[in-house]
Amino acid sequence: MTYIDPTHLDLEDRVVSINRVTKVVKGGRRLRFAAIVIVGDKNGHVGFGTGKAQEVPEAIRKAVEDAKKNLINVPKVGTTLPHEVIGRFGAGRVLLKPAVEGSGIAAGGAVRAVMELAGIDDVTSKTLGSKTAINVIRATIDGLTRMKTAEQIAELRNISVESLQN
């Protein structure tokens, strides 16, 4: 995975979930917050991050910084994905299918946020297995990293793009 410099990108961030986490100690309970954030430029770059802190804004800030370190490049064909793929992480699986232009994003929750910030306008998805936000996000990112354009597949097979499409 190649590093993508976030300073040259106009990134937006979206908070997917904020969890209240407690640690029980001898003196009582210690309260902290865990945040999951997705960042993207709506032009083929997207990443996610997690952060924990004693205050919500600090947890979100840490998550955004983490997300900027984990950016990936998403191949696009027009407004949709190049091909169908299943992303996996843990017990979570996400099926991502290209859709006809104008059909919109048929996805729920975390998958929708990832697709919107990646700049994918037309896609259909189905979440299979674990529906936990972090597992769904990681499975979606896994699916997007498995995406290959027709040019990349033709290069791997040492054939031309025209013969691949026939």
From Swiss-Prot:
Alphabetically ordered keywords of this record: Ribonucleoprotein, Ribosomal protein, RNA-binding, rRNA-binding
One of the GO biological process terms: translation
One cellular component term from this protein's GO annotations in UniProt: small ribosomal subunit
Superkingdom of this protein's organism: Bacteria
InterPro entries: Ribosomal_Su5_D2-typ_SF, Ribosomal_uS5, Ribosomal_uS5_bac-type, Ribosomal_uS5_C, Ribosomal_uS5_N, Ribosomal_uS5_N_CS, Ribsml_uS5_D2-typ_fold_subgr
Entry coiled-coil feature ranges: none
Domain S5 DRBM: 11-74
Pfam families listed in its UniProt record: Ribosomal_S5, Ribosomal_S5_C
GO molecular function: rRNA binding; structural constituent of ribosome
Signal sequence coordinates: none
Domain-related comment: The N-terminal domain interacts with the head of the 30S subunit; the C-terminal domain interacts with the body and contacts protein S4. The interaction surface between S4 and S5 is involved in control of translational fidelity.
Family: Belongs to the universal ribosomal protein uS5 family.
Role this protein plays: With S4 and S12 plays an important role in translational accuracy. Located at the back of the 30S subunit body where it stabilizes the conformation of the head with respect to the body.
PANTHER family: MITOCHONDRIAL RIBOSOMAL PROTEIN S5
Complexes and interactors: Part of the 30S ribosomal subunit. Contacts proteins S4 and S8.
Name by which UniProt lists this protein: Small ribosomal subunit protein uS5
Encoding gene per record: rpsE
